[in-house]
Amino acid sequence: GRDCLTGVDRNTVAGIYMASTSFPFQDRQNAGIVADALNLSTRIQTLDISSSQRAGSSALLTALQSVRSAEGPILVSASEKRRARAASPLELTTGDGAAAVLVGEGEPIAHYIGGHTEAVDFVDHYRGEGEAFDYNWEERWVRDEGYMKIAPNAINNLLDKVGVSAQDIDTFCFPVAMRRVASGLARKIGIAEESVADNLQSRCGETGSAHALVLLVHALEQAKPGEKILVAGFGQGCDVLLFEATDAIKAVGDRLAISGHLANGRPENRYTRYLSFNNLLTMERGIRAEVDKQTGLSTLYRNKGMSQKLLGGQCSDCGTCQFPKSKICVNPDCGAIGSQVDEPFADKAAKLNSYTADRLTYSPDPPTYFGMVQFEGGGRLMSDLTDIDPAVELEVGISMRMVFRVKDYDTLRGFRRYFWKATPQNDTH
């Protein structure tokens, strides 16, 4: 979402639609958490869309249909972190991922031509209430009766509706892990085989309800003006959306998008660490892991500007920035009382002033790194450090950026608390 909103006035955003089948909360609006992390206005519509692998494409379609009556653009974000049993086929083909697009009127990078939905209660897999893992049906039946019958019907209906020939499609995005399914669909519909988009199976895996948006964003990265992009989402039916890239695609700006984030990835070749991170092993975590991590909800709400939005303060008298915000200005030459106005720190450039690695305190990924982060323009924060490559030595003075991450898991009550952590600023950022 932050990458998508680069260069966008966040006060103009009128809504955020979140899509996932692995939301962290069942009865707390997850889109509201993301809205806070993005420091969006409270005068927006927030919506969670779930319960299907086409939740991402459905969220995008819903936003496109409702944006004309909205008071501004709508951010559509899809994310997924599904659990898979160890050594299962799903573990081999799926991955965690997210993507976001901004939908609105004006001068878009891609013009929406039209969309179509076929709702079919075709159960290729399911995850029942209280279950941690998906139950999957036989793959050949899913391919022959699902992908090869339901999807072509939806795609042909859309092409007939908008008056576009299958031969005019330049990029066909179909989110499926099975090899040759997308190319088989293309042949059946009449789309050129070279127009079939890479499903990114070798780079990130199939990212569930987010994968339609992941493929769409990846296609937009490579699109040229006038090219038509057909994207589908499959799950208890099929969503199909058709876009045409505009001249604005050439000036999209400096964003990481899908390629940049994949380039920032760090391979993990130790399988037991993967199992541990995904709670697929019963681990001895030691007595230091037995701390009660209950979150006081009243305290969380009182401090949510600081904890979820990373808002500090700026003195309206002398201009000094500080974190956290306080009643009295920290500038010894000022000391003004009640002069602080909100100052967002999440996107500020920062440097690492000092750091340490603690091997005594509990961490699921030891050691625990933390250090003093100095923000450009003023303000300091003693912060947890994350995504530290043990093969690359930290250095005082390196550039840092802030990322929104889980701070604590309260396993006794099923609550997770978020906060901001610092991570090294890679060149690709």
Regions found by a protein language model. Give the residues of each.
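Active-site pocket-shaping loop/turn-to-helix segments
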Residues: G1, L47-R54, L90-L92, A132-N153, ...
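Conserved catalytic cysteine-centered active-site region
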Residues: T21-P73, S183-L215
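Cys/His-rich short segments
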Residues: A289-A349
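Conserved hydrophobic positions within beta-strands
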Residues: A350-L352, L385
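Short nucleic-acid-contacting surface segments enriched for D/E, G, S/T with interspersed K/R
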Residues: D387-M402
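OB-fold/S1-family single-stranded nucleic acid-binding modules
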Residues: V403-H429
